[in-house]
Amino acid sequence: MAYSAAMKAAIGEMRDVLKAHGLGQQSKEFSAHGEHKPHDDAPFVFVACSGGRDSLALAACAQVVCAAWGIRCGAIIVDHHLQDASHKVAQQTAQTCRDLGLEPVLIVDVQVKERGQGIEAAAREARYAALVGTARRWHATAVLLAHTKDDQAESILIDLIRAAGTDAFAGMPQTQLFDDVLVLRPLLGITRAQTTRICEDEGLEYWDDPTNGDAVPLETALPASYPLRSRVRHDLMPYLSAFAGCDMVDRLARTARIARRDVEALNQEAERALAQTVEFEGNMRDLQADRLADDKLGANIDARALERWPEAIRYRVIARTLAACGLAYASRHVAAVDKLVSQWHGQGKVALPSKYSAKRKAHVIRICEDITHANRRCAKRN
């Protein structure tokens, strides 16, 4: 079958990413022409599909590659129930995925609970939980997400707007582990224009989320009520490209690839330093593990040992420690704890979120729930 240039590019990206994770051709029999059915024990991947142009292009591309390589490929459609048409969109998307040949195709209903982080973040949290939970139940090898080069560039700008730091320039990683489930982003080298072309060439009818602002003319700025990502896409990115006289999507995506290498090297060093300088107390499984609300975690930092590491590594170790304790920390909290490490002169404790504190005694910095608050909580429970 002859594929368009956009589809060929996406297939190439998909092959590279799958092969890099041991998901290459499963048997020589799949090199021969003709239709072949994956073996029952073949690796199994899920495509996360919303019905939008990016995820339908991903589904079509994944099915082509997986069918050719003997890999089982299914789809997960998450219905957030945030819009009136969500049920209809989910059903139509499921049928499109079945028509493409994906099996099984699952619709997963979720309840989005907004707890102060914003509805967009709450929906993302619910979606990832549903994808990871479903993948675990089906023993899937990986979940494929449809983030594109455009999404990568937009993510960098969003992270820079919301926070500062090296990690903001690294964007989204191509590979992530969520609760031991492998999550892959095979289309980070593919543009939204290419996914649109794939859908058009393959005759795939996609759905545009109205909150994306696609129906609003480019010369009209989106109101502040639209999600930040939509406003960055619709307003900021075109302005930056016009101002710079170049394709800022491509420029930012290339920046992300370079910065990602640096960030991963820093993270590896930080993990080594963490293992050597921090001891956790409580039910600690790993830094991404979910804990019960009353399952409080504390940590002891060997300040003398940590002081020997460069500042960039110290900050990452402290940030990981605070995150592992379940604290919604800010950069000022990390800096304040680092002063207990590198500028120690007998100062008092550092107040942290969630009624936690960091206090140094001799060479040990103890991070734990403030004793007064802990006593009150225990009294209420009893």
Swiss-Prot record:
GO molecular function terms listed in the Swiss-Prot or TrEMBL record: ATP binding; tRNA(Ile)-lysidine synthase activity
Record's catalysed reaction(s): cytidine(34) in tRNA(Ile2) + L-lysine + ATP = lysidine(34) in tRNA(Ile2) + AMP + diphosphate + H(+)
Residues reported to bind ATP: S50, G51, G52, R53, D54, S55
Keywords of this entry: ATP-binding, Cytoplasm, Ligase, Nucleotide-binding, tRNA processing
Top-level taxonomic group: Bacteria
Localization per record: Cytoplasm
Pfam families: ATP_bind_3, TilS
GO cellular component labels: cytoplasm
Entry keyword Transport: no
Gene Ontology biological process terms, A to Z: tRNA modification
Catalytic EC class: ligase
InterPro entries attached to this UniProt entry: Rossmann-like_a/b/a_fold (IPR014729), TilS/TtcA_N (IPR011063), tRNA_Ile_lys_synt (IPR012094), tRNA_Ile_lys_synt_N (IPR012795), tRNA_Ile_lys_synt_subst-bd (IPR015262)
Entry's free-text remark on domains: The N-terminal region contains the highly conserved SGGXDS motif, predicted to be a P-loop motif involved in ATP binding.
Family: Belongs to the tRNA(Ile)-lysidine synthase family.
Protein's job: Ligates lysine onto the cytidine present at position 34 of the AUA codon-specific tRNA(Ile) that contains the anticodon CAU, in an ATP-dependent manner. Cytidine is converted to lysidine, thus changing the amino acid specificity of the tRNA from methionine to isoleucine.
Name of the protein described by the UniProt record: tRNA(Ile)-lysidine synthase
Lineage of source species: Bacteria, Bacillati, Actinomycetota, Actinomycetes, Bifidobacteriales
